[in-house]
Amino acid sequence: ERMKVLKFLQKLTNDNLFVNRKTGVVTIGGKRWDNRSKNLKTGTSLLRDVINNKHTTTIYQNTDDERSAIALEKWGRKEFKHPDGSLPGSDVQIDIDLSPTTNTVRNPKTNRSENGYTPAEITLGHELIHSLRYMEGISTSEKEDYKYTDGTYLVTEKKQSVEELQTIGLGRYRNKYKYTENMLRREHNFQQRLSHISDD
């Protein structure tokens, strides 16, 4: 199980990752040779930031289609002040089904939305971005309307999670954060995700 999680973490980064078989702790070694043809700048940096954070993210694998990250303390969200003398942010638990899934993506040729294949490493990257945001205490529970074009149509999705818009890199958050799912998608030549709402 640990090796399977490690395999997908490894696909995101140019660093060589090791897992301690007793504790399950992941550490970074030197450069990885089998990813050398890819420049995985975003993923490499994301994993370094997650691994080097003072808080801990624990990844649990499942097979029941669950894909989520939860903060173990409420001050993983910016709406809650962390107790005096404590670090901002929270430890995190990720529950992830490592089978591929589908998401609403943009077809670059037609500019229309379609249901697109999403491999497990991209989903894992998405949850790791949530996890880093929780560990830094900048996650948010705000909601806002999100608009995008689908071919010639303007689509409005009401009361969307700002946390998801920021994590995926949608709308006005496209270039606002250091890490987004769509940056990871660009790095791996996958279509850009268009919406948090999926058809599955």
Q: Which residues fall in each region the model found?
A:
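Short acidic, glycine/tyrosine-flanked loop/strand segments centered on an H-E-D-like triad
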Residues: 91-108, 129-133
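Generic marker of residues within folded, mature protein domains
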Residues: 84-86, 114, 157
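Short pre-active-site segment immediately N-terminal to the catalytic Zn-binding motif
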Residues: 100-123
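N-terminal processing/targeting junctions
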Residues: 15, 102-104, 131-132, 141, ...
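Active-site or metal-binding loop neighborhoods of secreted/extracellular toxin and effector enzymes
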Residues: 1, 118, 135-200
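Structured segments of extracytoplasmic/periplasmic soluble domains
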Residues: 8, 12-15, 131-135, 170-174
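Active-site recognition of the HExxH zinc-binding catalytic motif
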Residues: 119-135
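Auxiliary, metal-adjacent structural segments of Zn-dependent hydrolase domains
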Residues: 1-101
